[in-house]
Each structure stands twice: as C-alpha cells, then as structure tokens.
C-alpha cells in the first residue's frame, strides 16, 4: 500500500498549485507563509505550464492510490444508493449519532470481514420475460460488472430487492406467504431452446410486509468475475401461495413501470447488486467505533516532537464532486524537535536514542526525526469513472501517534 503521508503530500501540493485562496482548513497556520511565498513566485507563464504538469502528475498518483484509471467525472444522473450511505455510516461509526430508525440495516460482518472494497451496481433497464415450468412470471435482468478491476478478488455478493405489501381485504391474504426465487441464467433463451437456469437462493416471505430482501448470488458473480464465464444475467421468480394469477409478481420492485406507489423513488428502490472484494492491499473493512479526539497532556516544551492538526477538505482541491463521504478528514502530521536527551514521551527507539547521543558530540550526524509511529485507516465512499458507487478502506491515512525515529 502506498504510505498515507504520500497522499497528504499530493493533496497539499495540489492545493498550492491550484492557487486557491482559502487554505484555512488544509494548511496549518505555521505553513501558510511558505504557501503564500510559493504562490507569489508563481506569477510567470512558465510557472503556470510547469504547475499544470505537476498537478496532473500529482492527481495521477492519487488516482492510482484509489485504483482509478482516470479522474471520475460524475454525471448528473448518478445515484448514491441509500444502502451504500448507510453501510458507510455503519462502517465508520457514524451510526452512533443517528437513530435506529434512520439506519435500518445490520452491518454485514461476514461479507466485510474478507473485503476492503464494496461496489454497488444497478441493473440495466431492459428486462426480459423468461418462460418457466410454472405460471409464475420470471423476469431476467442483467448487471454490467465490467468495471470490477482484474486484481480485485470477489469473495461474496448479495442481491437486494425491494418488496411492497399489496393491500387486500381478505384476512386470509394477510396471513399468507409468497416465495421469491433467484436463478442464474446458464444459457439464454433462443429460437431453438429454452433458457437454462440454476437456483441460487430462495426465500419464503410474508405478504403483509414492506422491506428489502437480500439474496446470496455469490456463485454466479464469482463465475463471471473470477472464472470469466459469460454473464447472461439473473432471473427472479415470485410465486404467491393460494393467490389469484392477477396478483402474481406485484410485490417485488424490479421495473420502473410497475403500477406501484412512490414512483419518484424508483432510483432508490430498484434492484441493487452489491459485491464485496479485496484488491490485495491493506486490511479488510472492520466496523469501527467513532474516532474520539485524543487529548495529550500539556508538555513543558511545545517545540518537541508531537502531533499537529491537519484537516484535509476535499472541496479545497476540487475532489468533492466524486468523493461522496467523508467531505474531509483530520489527517494530522508530526513536527517538532528531538532534543538530547530524548524524553520517554517522545516514543523513541533505541536506535534514535543512540543517534541523538552521537549527534550531541558530533553534529555531522543528524538528529533523530519526528515521524508518525502509528497510522490508522479511513473509509471513503466515492463514484468511480463508470458512475459506480464504491466504498473502500484506505490504510495509513490518519496519524495516531508521533515519535523520534
């Protein structure tokens, strides 16, 4: 994994080169004079061309860290699924500030335990009826997974379907059930043969409930991504027990045109395929408690090595159009002296103590340096270059502790 302090360098230098006027949140007080001097020296046309090339290089470095081929340019029609926002809040600990009614899902511990990347996909709008052995309607829909990188190993996948209750006067109806079956299309329908499908998951659910249902479709998606088998889509079949044919399939929301209420909510209620994968870099997603600020006791000499505040605001560098959350984060940085003799609170190594001792008698040997000794990860929710929503864990992004090394 590329060290987190490299990303901080990229962000800081991009801010300088962009020539923004508001550095309050991004540049610490002690660094503003140097930034102003750099900007003052940047008046020539030659500097403008050089800074443009540097900016492109820095942005390329950042995009490589994110695993992106190019800078995302989100379309106005891009939709952020509520599920992904809730998953981000649960994963980052923000649900502690929200009521249980606002976040109505449980964190998928099992799926996330082997993944550092979560991706969401909406199905393509074109739907197709697929004949089956029963009279229950079977609808085929396709998810385009071509944006999943080759180096990302998919470990589990879930299909989320929204179903609404259908009001009926019969008491027997309210006590009834219906079954939802999910199939993988192994061979599509053709003029010469019927479609061949295999059952992936099934669920018996109560009629009189409105909620999201989750189905395990891992075998199909792993075949498509890892084994490079053809993706012919999925089929949904809804069978209502002891129900008239006119009501078959009315519960599950898979099409914009279905005669259901809340038509304007289609963007949030349409089927959603969620993949959990790992790109081989960093640790898996883990549900974290909300990070509380560390309070360091007052030190006699504030010039010594310690942690300083550094808030990275993505809007300052123009990346807030594709980074959904967080809007920024407290990255911190390490700065200060490592004087002889090194005190215990400076978190030094034996080598740093020896180096500082030698420096006290031979100034040609440099002092120990104030550097991060503990770094933590952050989670980011963003739109990639294909307008797909991604939740990813990035290591070594926040300084938790400093020391002389």
Curated annotation (Swiss-Prot):
Proregion positions: 20-291
GO cellular-component term (any): extracellular space
Compartments in which it is found: Secreted
Disulfide bridge partners, by residue number: 305-370, 334-402, 338-404
Keywords: Chondrogenesis, Cleavage on pair of basic residues, Cytokine, Developmental protein, Differentiation, Disulfide bond, Glycoprotein, Growth factor, Osteogenesis, Secreted, Signal
InterPro entries for this protein: BMP4_TGF_beta-like, Cystine-knot_cytokine, TGF-b_C, TGF-b_propeptide, TGF-beta-rel, TGFb_CS
Database matches in Pfam families: TGF_beta (PF00019), TGFb_propeptide (PF00688)
PROSITE patterns assigned to the protein according to its UniProt record, in alphabetical order: TGF_BETA_1, TGF_BETA_2
The keyword Chaperone appears for this protein: no
Family: Belongs to the TGF-beta family.
Assembly and binders: Homodimer; disulfide-linked. Part of a complex consisting of TWSG1 and CHRD. Forms a ternary complex with chordin/CHRD and TSKU.
Protein name, as recorded: Bone morphogenetic protein 4
